[in-house]
Amino acid sequence: GDVCFSHKDFAGVHFTGSTQVFNAMWETIGKNIGRYRSYPRIVGETGGKDFVLAHKSADPDVVVTALLRGAFEFQGQKCSAASRAYIPSNIAEEVKKKLVAGVRQFKMGTVEDFSNFINAVIDGKSYNNIKQYIDKAKKDPKCQILVGGKCDDKEGYFVQPTVIETKNPTSTTMCEEIFGPVLTLYVYPASNFDKALELVDSTSPYALTGSIIAQDRKAIEHATVKLRHAAGNFYINDKPTGAVVGQQPFGGGRASGTNDKAGSQLNLYRWLSARTIKETFNPPIDFRYPFLQEK
């Protein structure tokens, strides 16, 4: 990195990784800006703290399925995974009951058995990071483990899919990226949807993916406008994951990156350098414009 970032011909970087590393890269590029022949193009795809927001009109079964798939596929080890959920009080008990039941149905094991929904997390570092978030939640008086919460690294790095309910909408697991099978939910008053929208928009520095689940069309349209800066990929009545390269341009803003939409022609525009060429076929031979000859 140091060799590239200090070279006079350095022209750009397309980075996928953590927000912290991307910030450090940007800082290094800024310090070296006087060395470059041109201003570098900088594109970043970084972290996420992706949300599912349910409206009081939402079908509980749709909410539960979106959470089970969105939070726990690939053990939550993708930047688009659902990590925080906002559930209205009128359907909260049903959602929690079915969510817990669904998690308990998951089979956990190695990847050779395709019937296993949950596998090990990628390595010991990731395992320890996820475990410390779960341990903190266990000690937090405002948090309750609804299901899961156990970890085992005797053979492989296995973390039970874990659902946490918090009474504090700004608790650690509602704000920070975990990158593991941990979902935190907050129950909000069903009559105060606008407050929930504010929480979704302001709680996390990230803005990668998110979804609204509702049957009320006005609520969907309202959320789509209010959360326009909260998610670069916004899903309606679905989980906040699964963008298909070439069909659904992917990327987010704020601390999630530069929102240059990988997998689409929008991204390619960042790497173009437009050049305008003019050729005159009847060049002038007198500097005087016609109006200068007027009397």
Feature-to-residue mapping (PLM):
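Short, solvent-exposed loop/beta-turn-alpha elements that line the ligand-binding surface or hinge
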Residues: M174
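ALDH superfamily catalytic-core signature
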Residues: S6-K8, G12, S18-P169, A190-D194, ...
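Conserved phosphate/anionic-ligand binding catalytic regions in large, soluble enzymes, centered on
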Residues: V244-V245, P249-L266
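Active-site donor-binding acidic/aromatic loop of nucleotide-activated sugar
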Residues: T184-Y186
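Glycine-rich nucleotide-phosphate-binding loops and adjacent flexible coil segments
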Residues: P181
